[in-house]
């Protein structure tokens, strides 16, 4: 049976990029992500996952990239996203997530052990740098 692709929402705001600490520790810190359901568009899956896991309402703003994840072998779709109604994020699925944080790129790199997908890293460099220069 083919496994469904996974969407990762790269949510940025004036506070930085949203990351989550997983309860199972695999990996300890990650972006908000989940399986794309059959017939679901990646952008709709990103909106659904972020809402379920953080309570945030977001809008997907574009594709960052795709790849087969080097550790899981899963097809990954990375989407840029922005909050539409505030930035207060709370853990919505305590079985899956332990903590949410808005962080800068250096903190995200440190928390994720330098494993951020190159296309995502480049997007965050550009996006967060533009934010910092405003």
Where are these regions (language model features)?
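Conserved N-terminal beta-strand and adjoining loop/helix that marks the start
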Residues: 1-17, 35, 64
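Conserved Nudix-box catalytic region and its N-terminal flanking loop in Nudix hydrolases
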Residues: 12-52, 56
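Structural detector for helix-capping/boundary residues
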Residues: 34, 48, 61, 103-106
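A short coil-to-beta-strand element that immediately follows conserved catalytic motifs
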Residues: 57-65
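Active-site-adjacent beta-strand/loop module that shapes the phosphate/pyrophosphate-binding cleft
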Residues: 67-90, 101-107, 116-127
